[in-house]
Amino acid sequence: MNVGIIGRGGREHAICYMLNKSKKVSGIFCFPGNAGTSLIAQNVNLDLDNFSELERYCLKKDIKMLVVGPEKPLVNGIVNHFKGKSIRVFGPDKISSKLEGSKIFTKKICQKNNIPTSKFKICESLNETIDYLKNSYFPLVIKADGLASGKGVYICKNFNDAKIASEEIFNGKFGVAKQILVEEFLDGEEMSYFIVTDGKNYKFFGSAQDHKRVGEGDTGKNTGGMGCYSPSRLLNKDLELKIKKKIIEPTLNAINERGGVYKGFLYVGLMIKNNDPFLIEYNVRMGDPECQTILPTLNTDLFDVLISCCDGTLNQTNIDFSRSKSICVVLCSKGYPEKFKNNIKIKDLNQIKLLKKQNIFHAGTLKTTSGLVSNGGRVLNFVSTSDDFLKCRDDAINLIKKLNWKEGYFRRDIGHKVIKT
């Protein structure tokens, strides 16, 4: 079967890499892809806001399944566009995608269904927000309601921080803002828990801990993710049962009641305190870099997982992961997540010899006539799996050192909560 992958990041390269190993996949097309995907797939530049144009191309190339990597096409209704047509789309429909498209939508579902989460206040203007903040306890969390590429969350230590965050959001930093979410700050440790679902059944698809802050020791500004380790050190049977019964199942039931059809990945962002889970956020796709970290440990053919979700037969598919540990270290452009330069040459990447349990997934890269260049804030993902987290991290960092890209920056402490040195 010919398969199309929508997206340009490290997540999409990892998906492409896994599908390329499947004997059931005859051809892969990436929309638009990156320099890494171009090595194993055909990159195609289309207007991804024009679903009809995408449909015509898929019909022309006999693409039978689309895998949607990023959230924007899902929130914009790509699944609804292809409903009832000959092309399957792996991903949730427009109603289901509001779980990520609107944090306020998700909070209201939590409130109605007694899903454990932080206390919150919805504010509809800057003045209302500031008035509320004057009588609030700190620290607290301020969130932009819509999509913000993982960067619309502010942890505010005092009134002044919160005021600045609110002004940035209402002044349009993440697009037009009509509402803002002010949340209680939850003390604990974060964990990401993943499932796949076919709309009726769901199955576990890995756990991880992302490192969002740009600086070592989890300091500095939020990013899309500087690295990740998997599995999470926090996960145990008792906690997992609580996550399923108190959070995932009530949410999926609520989506079904609203007429949504959820087929795809669900990323459950959690705060864990005293072995109790609290929902921080949902993402309606795999995380990035969690996807790059988890997929190399998957023993099952990824194509079988994706197609069974599309066809409603997930209960017939056994999903098996190795017991290996995995770490991804992200190499970024200097200056990220603020100002950074693009089109910086990356030399000798193809000279790096990878061992069996090592991968380099491209993200912000571009293949040009003069060679490989950077094309984004997060540039390359260095992934290693083994039976020891420290070895994973050391191996990933050694790969970065071999590249010796002087325009890059990376964190050396990925997995610091699980690695004691």
Mark where each language-model region is:
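Active-site "cap" helix and flanking loop/linker of ATP-utilizing ligase/carboxylase catalytic domains
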Residues: 244-266, 283-355, 366
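Short, charged, surface-exposed secondary-structure boundary motifs
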Residues: 38-41, 98-104, 215-216
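Internal nucleotide-binding/catalytic subdomain
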Residues: 153-291
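A conserved helix-loop-beta module that forms one wall/lid of the active-site cleft
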Residues: 90-151
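ATP-binding N-terminal substructure of ATP-dependent carboxylate-amine bond-forming enzymes
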Residues: 1-94
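Generic C-terminus detector
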Residues: 365-369, 373-421
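Short acidic-hydrophobic, aromatic-tinged amphipathic segments that line or gate anion-handling sites
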Residues: 43-49, 121-125, 156
